[in-house]
Structures are given as structure tokens and as C-alpha cells.
A protein has these predicted regions:
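Short terminal hydrophobic/aromatic SLiMs and anchors at protein ends
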Residues: 4-5, 9
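Well-ordered secondary-structure scaffolds
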Residues: 24-294
Length: 294
């Protein structure tokens, strides 16, 4: 597998090199570093594209074991053999890219985005609304999910709703509006989500990957148990010690149980990542991609 990706990576370098240490033919800045953003990043990284993420100082990704946002908390993490590292300066970003790693920075606005001047920007915050991304941020700006309108605040939108159009690239209009109900997996939707039972500190969390039964206690908040409604595998859980509010999404149970490979990115993340790669190919021909950060 390494030789396969290595072959394509060397071939792509022949077309274009950016100014980040000759480590890719395109430089993409991804806002957000949760599990779906990480799936996008892995797809682009394996295509030879240099990627940098931004996220919150205290990330709230539930599926932490497949989220590059863990690099902010731990300093370094790996997903499917790709290593992400925390970076706090432009120099540290460049050093990470030179080692074929994925830098992740703390930036709740667009300070680093403006400094780096990437070829493309992907907004994968998944806030269901636009938190400041503009179509003028880069030559190609891609919005993930609802909250964006292609041709207005971005060049393309990638559909995130499970179903026939998952991963579809929209060059005009918007993604399907948020329903507030998670996609159906194994016959369950909202029942899959674990929500904090009260305001307070998340404690006594079960490890991600634990098989649970309906009614099992998966964590505790202020002495109140957070129970799962269904049986399955615990695919996500916020880090112990984080402050939560009542009703906040704090965990995720997949009813497919042992059949789920919770240590790899999801089918949904891969589909969305494919859509992003398609959009980049549409807007930025390889031979014209040359990052000019100076």
C-alpha cells in the first residue's frame, strides 16, 4: 500500500509543487479537525496534497480516535497510519509538512488562513451554518454540509446527509438542510447519540470500542449517569474531564456492534473526502497549482 501511494505522490509532484518544502502539489487549509474533516484530510493526503487543519483550543470531536483534533490535546496522533502533529507557528507548520505529517493548529478564526494563503479552503466545521468562511478566502473554497451556498460564500458544497447523494458535489445551491436527526444506521437514528444528562464535568467514561447493552452507563455527569438507549459498540466519547452542558452530544453508539471498524474513518467520511477531491480537481487543474505564500 505504501508503494502505491508513494508512486502516485511522486507522479503528482511532477506537475506542481507549492512553497511548503516540496511536499505536495497543492496546499489545502481545512477548518475543523473532527472525524469527517479527518476523513477528508486522509483522502487528500494520500493523493499527495499538503493539508493543514485548524480547530478549537478544546476540541469537541466525539469520535476522537479517528480525529486529527486529538493532536491539539496530545501533541501528536495517528489515524490509518497518517500522523498529525500540533503546530503553533508557521515554521512548525512547514516543518510538519516537510516530514509528510499533517499540522493541526489552534485557530478559532482565520488568522493562520490569512497568513498561509492556501490554494484551497475546506470548511469542515460542520456547524450547520457558516462561521466566517468567504468565497474570497482562496481560489477554491468548499463548504461541507448545510449552511453554505455554492456561488455565494463558497465555490462548491459537498453533501453530508446519508443516502443517495452523500458526497455529491454541488456547484450551485446548498446541501440538504439539517433535520436535527442523525442518519439511520441499523434502524436507529437519534437513539445512537449519547447526550449529557446535565451541566458539569464528564467523568467515568467507558473506552471507545466498548461493547454496550441498552441501559448501560457510558459516563457520569454531576453524579447523573449517561446511559445508552441501544446495544452496540461505543464508537465515540468526549474526553474525560471536559465541561459539558445538558443535551450536548457526548458520545455515539453504533448498533452494528463488532461489525464496525471503529478505529478507521467511516464510510461517510470517505465519501465526503472523495467529493472534496473531485471539487478540487474541478477548480484547480494540477498543472496550474502553485502555492505563492510569499
Amino acid at each position: 500500500m505504501e508503494s502505491y501511494y508513494g508512486f502516485h505522490y511522486r507522479r503528482n509532484l511532477a506537475f506542481c509543487q507549492n512553497s511548503f518544502g516540496k511536499e505536495g502539489f497543492m496546499f489545502v487549509f481545512i477548518r475543523g479537525a473532527g472525524d469527517l474533516a479527518t476523513g477528508i484530510s486522509i483522502r487528500l493526503h494520500r493523493a499527495g496534497i499538503s493539508v493543514c487543519h485548524s480547530d478549537l483550543a478544546i476540541p469537541t470531536a466525539v469520535r476522537r480516535n479517528v480525529a486529527f483534533s486529538e493532536a491539539i490535546r496530545l501533541g501528536e496522533c495517528s489515524v490509518e497510519g497518517i500522523t498529525a502533529v500540533r503546530a503553533d507557528t508557521v515554521e512548525e507548520i512547514e516543518a510538519a509538512l516537510a516530514e509528510r505529517k499533517v499540522p493541526v493548529i489552534v485557530d478559532e478564526g482565520k488568522e493562520f488562513l490569512h497568513k498561509l494563503k492556501p490554494d484551497a479552503v475546506v470548511d469542515a466545521i460542520l456547524a450547520k451554518r457558516n462561521l466566517g468562511t468567504a468565497i474570497t478566502d482562496a481560489r477554491a473554497v468548499i463548504g461541507i454540509g448545510p449552511g453554505f451556498t455554492a456561488g455565494v460564500d463558497c465555490h462548491a458544497v459537498v453533501e453530508t446527509k446519508r443516502g443517495h447523494d452523500l458526497g455529491r458535489v454541488l456547484l450551485e445551491g446548498s446541501a440538504i438542510p439539517n433535520t436535527g436527526i442523525p442518519g439511520i444506521i441499523g434502524g436507529y437514528g437519534k437513539e445512537r447519540v449519547l447526550r449529557a444528562p446535565a451541566d458539569g464535568i464528564l467523568e467515568k467514561t467507558l473506552p471507545i470500542g466498548t461493547l454496550v447493552k441498552a441501559g448501560d452507563v457510558c459516563a457520569v455527569v454531576n453524579g447523573i449517569p449517561m446511559r445508552t438507549e441501544i446495544a452496540g459498540v461505543l464508537r465515540g466519547m468526549l474526553q474525560e474531564g471536559i465541561t459539558v452542558f445538558a443535551g450536548m452530544k457526548a458520545g455515539d453508539v453504533d448498533p452494528r456492534g463488532e461489525a464496525v471498524e471503529y478505529r478507521n474513518v467511516s464510510d461517510k467520511a470517505r465519501a465526503i473526502g472523495g467529493g472534496v477531491l473531485e471539487a478540487l480537481l474541478h477548480f484547480l487543474p494540477w498543472e496550474l497549482c502553485e502555492n505563492k505564500r510569499n
